[in-house]
Regions:
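Ribokinase/PfkB-type carbohydrate-kinase core domain
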Residues: 1-169
């Protein structure tokens, strides 16, 4: 039986999303980790997400990492994003959600709504600096107590973020 932590993430083929970047760092530190994405030459926006064998991919995985903005990457990434969290819950993996800003900042409310719909499946919720400010503004809360309020309302075990302007985590 394999030992140690294993992480998987749904990521774009270029590796430019935060989940792919986290997996790259984890791999460089020696953690067994992999990125699930479209096949080479396949359009990521419309890749065959139904071909992903989540049960196999999650065998022995401890963590599944997703980015909130993945729901705006196209219909297939959005469906794979949702499926990854559902299968993680069924297979006993922990879900990490990195709440980042979508390429179109106007869609942040839709992205945040999608995260809220999956909140019971999330174990770690991390906000990037820009998303922390945008979502706290959406929620009508100042940044200083926003993370605590999210934690209390959602019962997610770990809610965290980083604010460059406040120099706090």
């Amino acid at each position: 039986m394999e030992q140690g932590v294993r992480m998987i993430a749904l990521g774009d083929p270029e590796g430019s999303d935060k989940a792919s970047q986290l997996i790259a760092i984890a791999s460089s530190l020696g953690l067994r980790s992999s990125i699930i994405t479209s096949n080479p030459g396949e359009n990521f926006e419309s890749f065959n997400h139904g071909a992903i064998d989540w049960k196999e991919k999650m065998a022995m995985a401890h963590w599944v990492v997703n980015t909130a903005s993945m729901v705006t990457a196209g219909p297939s990434p959005a469906m794979a994003w949702s499926a990854s969290m559902t299968f993680a819950e069924l297979e006993g993996c922990r879900n990490v959600m990195i709440v980042d800003m979508p390429s179109d900042p106007e869609s942040i409310s839709m992205v945040w709504g999608q995260v809220i719909e999956k909140v019971r499946q999330i174990h770690v919720l991390f906000f990037t600096s820009d998303s922390l400010h945008a979502i706290s503004k959406l929620e009508g809360s100042d940044g200083s107590d926003f993370l605590s309020r999210v934690r209390e309302k959602t019962m997610i075990p770990l809610v965290c973020g980083y604010s460059e302007s406040d120099s706090c985590a």
